[in-house]
Amino acid sequence: MKKLIEAALPLTDINAKTIREKKLAPGHPAHLHLWWGRSPISSVQSALAASLIDAPESDEELKSRLARVQSREVPEFGKKPTILDPFCGFGGVALAAQSLGLPAVASDLNSVAVMLTKAATEIPAKFANVSPVNHSALRKQYFGTEGLAEDVAYYGNLLREKAWEKLKDIYPNEQEGTPSAWIWARTVKCPNPACGCTMPLASSFILCSKGTNEIWAEPVLQDGAVHFELQHGCCPKEKMSNKVGSQGAVFRCPACGSLTTDAYVKQMGSSHKLGAQMMAISLETEDGIKYIAPSEKQMHAANVPIPEDAPPGEIPDNPHWFTPPGFGLKNYADLFSSRQLTMLTMFCDLLPEIQDKAASDALAAGMDASGGSLSNGGTGALAYGQAIGVYLAFVIDKIADANSTICSWRITGNSLRNTFGRQAIPMVWTYAEGNPFSKITGNLSSTLKSVVNAIRNLPIGSEVSVLQQDARMATYPQNIMVCTELPYYKAIGYAALSDYFYIWLRKSLKTIYPELFNPMVTSKDELSTCGQYEGKHAAECEQTYEVQMRDVLAQLAEHADRNFPQLFFFEFHKGDELALVNGNNGTASPFETLIGSMLHAGYEITAVWPMRNAAASEKADGTRVLIAARVHDKTEQTTRRGFAAALKREFPMVFERMLCAGVDVSDEKIVGIGAGLSLFTRYKKVLNASGSDMKIHDALELIYQEILGYLKEKNADSEADTVQLEEE
């Protein structure tokens, strides 16, 4: 039976909700932990609902069923399909399935992705409707994840109290207030032998800017050394920074005027001769934020030894995503100051004590004493204490994101930027070291609150099983309905980027999930990892990806439930459309390659829908699309001429119906490609006059011409109607 997603979708409404979701209101599950390229829950919910609702025969009934998609109403029927997401990432698909009451199996090779998905779906279901076990809980009845959230808040505050007692000496207050941040500049020895002073490498000396009222740290030479004096007013342009140009590590020495070269700074960094100097301190006072010059007390407090148990982990030598290794910062621990390392390792080291306290309280509250550990499926007191530990480990990870030497300072907001402002780790020259016990961005209290609010809103509607497995070698249950974001090998370096968090999760959670966190770093042998950025040729990477993706799709097809469409999200790039306009020079575009792999695996494309994460923009390179496909044993074949005739005859009606529920003009062509592919891929073969198989590119070119013709006629009719109305 044809499903609604294969006929029409209220696309404008769905995309508007998805774009609103991207703003991440407090309590959104994404606040549990950072992940890149998340599956928006709202659009997946709509796609799943539309895949379960039968397509109607009448236009009147179509309106009714489209309304059910907008309200995400799942039809009641016997056995519900099991949703499979073999590239689960953050767990957005599993969350969407769970909220609709659909059972799901989610898996990923990446340990961080598996842990996030377990925490978002699997763990809350284990402890649904439990009452808090801490002694300060006031209510008697709790629903959903309310009790779990309240306990995470309680034991998180206990972690903060214990950590403060251990760390207060290295985070001293001033008489006027509490330091919220210490602002630093990296340093290097001046390359001029006649000077040789320790010079700052400051991308900005400005600390605060409100119109023409600015505060800046001015480097001053005294007794052969550079120190900083704070100035107020309008900072002269030449004093805003000693960075020269926009490219490379070129800085001017404030003492002698000599310039560094990028090569010199990299050489000094590789010799472990990069340092850092405190420029200023941001204070929280009764009158607001105030800036003061560094004091001996504050500089002494920051000068702590690197902890011996700092987590190991080497940063990949991959300048596409990581700039710091080129300057000698080759390990993840090198991205943190010694005080930041001390603070983060202390949080991790205190976690077992907090878990034991939570488990002891759970036992006293009546939880089962013999339930086993969390990793073995336990649901008793031990597992509950460990679950608290998982969410507090996420709090520590989020603090690590806001507390590294990659965090720059916002001069207009008196706050710091997180490490991951984008999907890479750049080199930062002027950085801010936040105080986790203050009110600054990324402090422990506000971070804990954001995680707790996210837990409160997690669904517990159905069973979700989360596994660590490689999609290329996994075994899947029969009769599954696939819904997944297909990775593209040149998009995001998930494995490499996630190691930044993995090293801290491993330190926090290895005793709870020993197998998941056994390796020193995450596996880099995955579909989304591009060897091109590690020295391999682009053609070799592309071929490897294509072969492996084809095998994965074939494996999924073998286990697909043929009663339902299978759903694949993918990135459709401008280059994919340009290949249809200008030709592809004999090289298949990524979209063509994917369609080819799907046909090879036995799929029939039934629709392609633009499922946007952001509003349409000329600057955007790609559009997230949803490909709906069926697994069929196709027997019918036709000729190129026969396909062209079918396209002329059937395409307008199919395309018109797909557009009827509301599709933005910017999305019409992609929807048309789906309509055309539904006609092309229903055949086992389409043969050229020579007897050879018709190429997908050739079919897409024919489809594209039909789309342009249809839209031209549609727009002409619309203009004619407008003229007629004006005349009347």
What are these regions (language model features)?
Residues 86, 107, 484:
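Conserved beta-strand/loop positions that form the S-adenosyl-L-methionine
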Residues 546-564, 596, 600:
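A short glycine-rich, Lys/Arg-flanked "PGG" loop and its adjoining helix->strand segment in the class I
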Residues 565-570:
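Short beta-strand segments at enzyme active-site cores
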Residues 90:
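Conserved SAM/SAH-binding loop
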Residues 540-547, 574:
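Extended, compositionally biased non-globular segments
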Residues 483-491:
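A short SAM/SAH-binding and catalytic strip from SAM-dependent methyltransferases
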Residues 1-83, 94, 98-479, 491-538, ...:
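Nucleic-acid modification enzymes, centered on SAM-dependent nucleic-acid methyltransferases
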Residues 545, 582-583:
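A generic structural signal for short
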